[in-house]
Amino acid sequence: MMVGSSSEKKIPLYDEQNDYINEDHISEFAKALVWQDYDDVSTTAPTTPLNGPLDMGDLSLLGGELGNGSDDVVVGDDDDDDDDDDDDDDDDDDDKTKYSSPQLKAAQEINDEATEIGAVPATTKPDLISSKNDWFPINSENLNPNSKRTKFAKSSKSSKSKSTSPIRALQNEFRNSASFTLLRWPILTFVVIWVTILGFLYLAVRVYVALLEYFFTWTGERKRLRDKLRQSTTYKEWIENAKELDKYLGLDKWATNPKFSYYDSQTVQLTINKLKKARLNNSMPELLILLQGCLKRNFAGIENRQLYSHMYYGTKNLVQDYYKEVVICINKVIESNEINSETKYKFFKTVLQNFGKSALCLSGGACFAYTHFGIAKALLDQDLLPNIISGTSGGGLIAALLCTRTNEELKKLLVPQLARKITACEDPWYVWIPRLLKTGARFDSVAWARKSNFFTKGSTTFEEAMAMTGRKLNISTVPADPHSPVILCNDITSPHCIIWSTLLASSAVPGILNPVVLMMKNPVNGAVVPFSLGSKWRDGSLRTDIPIDALNTYYHVNFTIVSQVNPHISLFFFAPKGTVGRPVSMSKRKTAKEKFASFRGGFIATALEQLFRLEIKKWLQIVKSLDLLPHVLQQDWSNVWLQNFTGTITIWPRNRLIDFWYILSDPNEKQMEEIITKGERSMYPKILFIKNRLSIEKAIEKGRKTSTAELRETQMNVALASDDDEDYVPSDYSLAKFKDRIGVTSKDFDMLGSTLRDDDADADVDEDDNEDEDEEDEDENDYEEYDVEDLDDPYESDAFDPHIVLTKERRHTVY
């Protein structure tokens, strides 16, 4: 009865019955892992234990039917064949008696033929010379001394003694001096001791500030109102509670005074007055010029975080008036019939480039990353989810879900029942501990590939995801080689790359998951093949957790919303001057005197906190610059602390001490409900800032789309690119204008054309030349140019009226 009643209460999850797993794609991924490891004879990565013989029951995992892999043989060592002929004959007899089905017998015959030529057939796991295991060094001494692999290594040791791995060579180039050898470890020991002392001092300052606020600041009615604010269940309820707390503390008076040192209030007020005057007078030329001047990132400092850090909800009234007036004026331009469609198009394209775009960046952080579900839900409920989303490690899983589902689907999926699809850590200890000891990783790559397919909607590529939802997904990964550059996988750098393979690579933390091969769909035939020549990739958070620079390069992003849940970074979040939606607590006595600025914990405590934190960072930077830290597991771990982990807006969800116990465990539905709620409440204080920014961004995007549609209607013969980076303005070129410019009459032009036709008829062109010309024509079509003619509008500003040639360029991709 108990089981039946619980099953009846089970709430179904949208699309729960679909796992979207393509077994063929998983099989190709598994084969790529195996064969890539075998081919890496001179790899710079550590090695794995030897693979055992392949069980015939597992062949579906490595390539499907037996006959399909019969030609995939790897040449072995010829020297060992003669010595082991008798043993091979005995093994063959045993194998023939073991495999009786026709397919297995055919596979055995292939094995016999391969043995005669000194090769290892594809139906047997190869003895890996080296692979991407994170725990054991190259040519590990832990190998079995009686194995063929060890004998081969010893026999070839003399011939390879002079060769070293690229990583070791790079290290030796900078570590070969006598002074470095002599002073490295003493300096490193001193730094470790000194940083440890600084860490204890930093902890003491933080404890002092926390106790001061707990016992002296947040007491009585103030504490009751703050607790009420923290327990808000909806954003509307949160706004009401925040306004009540602001009124009690007297912070609402701060919003009425337009003067503030962190932005130019006079410029903002003057801009509002001029925009309103031009709009009311219906002076469209002046309105266009004014809008182009103010539609820029952080105009007059209105995007300064301090404007939102002095109240729990709200900012300066003047700032709110500015955003409202600008949006009204943009809509006025969109609806105006006095401006032709081409002028509108050029105007909105220009201001969109000046204003920039917004992006949501989700950090890594193991199971803490599930807090991003609540962050995304809060943005989705307010229709504020950006179209550009990046994710790293655990954050990549949430980013993939957001970019492969529509808004309607996400509203059905971002619920506690989603926990039933999160099974990455379901293996018990007696399963993953042997795997960790054997492979150097707690989790299995192929198993994770299957489990991630639901979140990526199967083997969806970056290009396909953008076509489905209009969102641009970005996953940060780094090569297994620590000296290779980071790649941000997206629809530009890797449009055909399969998303779930990048998720595995972005989660490949040493000891958790071994580096994996990225997979892609061949754009010609759709076959799944390794990406980037089969190189292996690992967790991007090791070097680039928040790829702000790359997002700016690819998508012109200059406003980032960062959800930061990395536990080793959250510990150092202090906000001495307050942060968005969380002002520094101060007494009512100060606010009554209209003194709204104060350092958290006082000036001395803030100064000490800054001193100790920056001192720790300085010594870590010295260690990295001098290359003093050993590269444990072939990784420079100093990058984990020295990255840029923040954005324009950074959300720091609160973590309890008990949460660290579940850092590598799957949440149940109750825990998932708490996690989503925690993420939503962390997002509420930031929504107003984001809403103001996106109100202008959405209005500009609306104008761009509207003007593009109008231009298509008026000039149907010109194809406009739908992508932001490939938009171009059509030309008003005509044959009559061309004749007037070159000074010829229609009769002269016809004579010139007749002469050219006669020359073409007499020309003797080879077939090879024709083919070359056809190929050149195709290339020219890909780079077709469109001239922009002057519209002779009296009000058009020079900034968006250039005589330029816009080129539709081919995207550079790596297949």
Curated annotation (Swiss-Prot):
Under Enzyme Commission nomenclature, its number is 3.1.1.-
GO molecular function, a single term: triacylglycerol lipase activity
The protein's matches in PROSITE patterns, at most eight in alphabetical order, are given as:
PNPLA
Extent of Acidic residues compositional bias: 74-94, 759-799
Disordered: annotated span:
41-105, 140-166, 753-815
Ordered alphabetically, the record's keywords are: Hydrolase, Lipid degradation, Lipid metabolism, Membrane, Transmembrane, Transmembrane helix
What spans are recorded as compositionally biased (Low complexity)? 54-73
What biological-process terms (Gene Ontology) are attached? lipid catabolic process; triglyceride metabolic process
**Active site per UniProt:** S393 (nucleophile), D539 (proton acceptor)
Which cell locations does it reside in? Membrane
Presence of keyword Membrane? yes
Q: Where is the PNPLA domain?
A: 360-552
Motif GXSXG at which residues?
A: 391-395
Q: Which InterPro entries match?
A: Acyl_Trfase/lysoPLipase, NTE, PNPLA_dom, Triacylglycerol_lipase_N
Which of the seven top EC classes does this enzyme belong to? hydrolase
Give the membrane topology.
Answer: Single-pass membrane protein
One GO CC annotation, please?
membrane
Polar residues bias located where? Answer: 41-50
Main subcellular localisation: membrane
Q: Where is the composition biased (Basic residues)?
A: 148-160
One Pfam match, given by its short name, reads: DUF3336
Bilayer-spanning residue ranges: 185-205
Give the function comment from the record.
Probable lipid hydrolase.
Family per UniProt? Answer: Belongs to the PLPL family.
* Name under which the protein is recorded: Patatin-like phospholipase domain-containing protein LELG_00944
Q: Which organism is it from?
A: Lodderomyces elongisporus (strain ATCC 11503 / CBS 2605 / JCM 1781 / NBRC 1676 / NRRL YB-4239) (Yeast)
